[in-house]
Amino acid sequence: KPKEDREWEKFKTKHITSQSVADFNCNRTMNDPAYTPDGQCKPINTFIHSTTGPVKEICRRATGRVNKSSTQQFTLTTCKNPIRCKYSQSNTTNFICITCRDNYPVHFVKTGKC
């Protein structure tokens, strides 16, 4: 697989969820081995409540490696500040800034415009 495909797969796993805000649970999700590869609790992670299409669309016509802002707002859940892997959870609706590599989202930069 090309590197972009692998990075996009990783991005989808780490940042895109089909769960509704009401059903989403930071503690359950963040304690999954996918988010704790070295056994450490990740300090913060933002999840985009969306299908993959609108997120990938942000990177359409993005050549090379570049940060791009979404043109639409997404529903987001941020899991942060774990104390013994118990997370605080906050929900918001906002634009997102992501790193694109050759038309694929590969890194979540921040909530809000770039």
Swiss-Prot record:
Subcellular location: Secreted
Top-level class of the enzyme under EC nomenclature: hydrolase
SUPFAM superfamilies tied to this protein: RNase A-like
Gene Ontology cellular component annotations, sorted alphabetically: extracellular region
Keyword annotations: Disulfide bond, Endonuclease, Glycoprotein, Hydrolase, Nuclease, Secreted
One Pfam family recorded for the sequence: RnaseA
Post-translational modification: There are at least four different forms arising from glycan heterogeneity.
Binding site for substrate: 42-46
UniProt-annotated catalytic positions: 15 (proton acceptor), 107 (proton donor)
CDD domains with a match to the protein in the record: RNase_A_canonical
Disulphide bridges, residue numbers: 26-79, 41-85, 59-100, 97-114
Chief subcellular location: secreted
UniProt GO MF annotations: endonuclease activity; nucleic acid binding; RNA nuclease activity
UniProt keyword Hydrolase, yes or no: yes
Oligomeric and partner information: Monomer.
Protein's job: Endonuclease, hydrolyzes highly polymerized RNA, poly(U) and poly(C), and the dinucleotides CpA and UpA. Hydrolyzes 18S and 28S ribosomal RNA. More active towards rCA than rUA or rUG. Has cytotoxic activity against cultured human submaxillary gland carcinoma cells.
Protein family membership: Belongs to the pancreatic ribonuclease family.
Name the UniProt record assigns to this protein: Amphinase-2
Organism: Lithobates pipiens (Northern leopard frog)
